[in-house]
């Protein structure tokens, strides 16, 4: 169980730092067994302990339970009276690196147009591609960082971020560099996904095989070379 916290311990070799969070109003997702996968009716269960404590040792949870069983030895403590603690959210599918918006397409959908109809006239992903290619890397980073901070504030602790709105080597590298910079500047775990093959760019409209070859022989090797 991973729980987001403001108070981070400094971990050194042979050095142990313990932090006790006490008087927790309610501690969620505590289970007797260590199930790594929940499915079906199991997902309806959201176990908790009221009036709880949580003990952290060098950034790892080592103990938790009712306040009546709280440890008496620790290095620092945090009174969490009136507050709840729960594991951070894992957001496994996002497209938060983008430029502009497609709000007009929302109106088009309300008016009855299908996604294919919108796509055929240059909307959908192709609309996002055009805007992203024109945006600077600094602009993309700033806007994406703002979106990421909103997600963190709402409790996200692990996030996957896709590229795929560039559809060219230069634009995809730009997106992946933005994601790498976010990885370096924010404490949450960020996983990058190279997601270019979900649409065909205008320059390869009549040569889809050529686009696949470009991905395999040019894009993937260069992205691997740059460690993105």
Would you name each region that the model predicts?
Residues 20, 75-79:
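Conserved beta-strand scaffold positions in the cores of enzyme catalytic domains, especially
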Residues 128-143, 149, 157-228:
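Metal-coordinating catalytic core of metallo-dependent amide/deamination hydrolases
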Residues 66-76, 185:
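Short, glycine- and charge-enriched coil/turn segments that flank and shape catalytic ligand pockets
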Residues 80-142:
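Metal-associated gating/positioning segment near the N- to mid-region
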């Amino acid at each position: 169980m991973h729980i987001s916290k403001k108070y981070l311990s400094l971990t050194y070799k042979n050095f142990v730092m313990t932090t006790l969070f006490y008087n927790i109003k309610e501690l969620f997702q505590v289970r007797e067994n260590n199930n790594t996968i929940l499915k079906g009716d199991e997902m309806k269960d959201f176990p908790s302990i009221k009036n709880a404590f949580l003990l952290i040792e060098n950034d790892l949870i080592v103990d938790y339970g009712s306040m009546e069983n709280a440890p008496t030895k620790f290095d620092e403590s945090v009174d969490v009276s009136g507050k709840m603690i729960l594991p951070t959210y894992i957001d496994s599918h996002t497209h938060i690196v983008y430029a502009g918006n497609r709000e007009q397409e929302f109106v088009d959908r309300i008016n009855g147009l299908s996604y294919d109809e919108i796509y055929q006239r240059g909307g959908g992903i192709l609309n996002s591609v055009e805007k992203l290619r024109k945006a600077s890397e600094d602009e993309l980073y700033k806007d994406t960082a703002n979106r990421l901070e909103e997600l963190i504030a709402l409790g996200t602790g692990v996030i996957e971020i896709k590229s795929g709105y560039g559809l060219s080597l230069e634009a995809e590298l730009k997106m992946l560099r933005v994601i790498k910079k976010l990885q370096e500047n924010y404490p949450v775990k960020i996983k990058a996904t190279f997601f270019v093959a979900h649409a065909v760019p205008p320059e390869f409209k009549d040569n889809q095989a050529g686009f696949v070859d470009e991905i395999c022989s040019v894009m993937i090797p260069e992205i691997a070379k740059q460690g993105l």
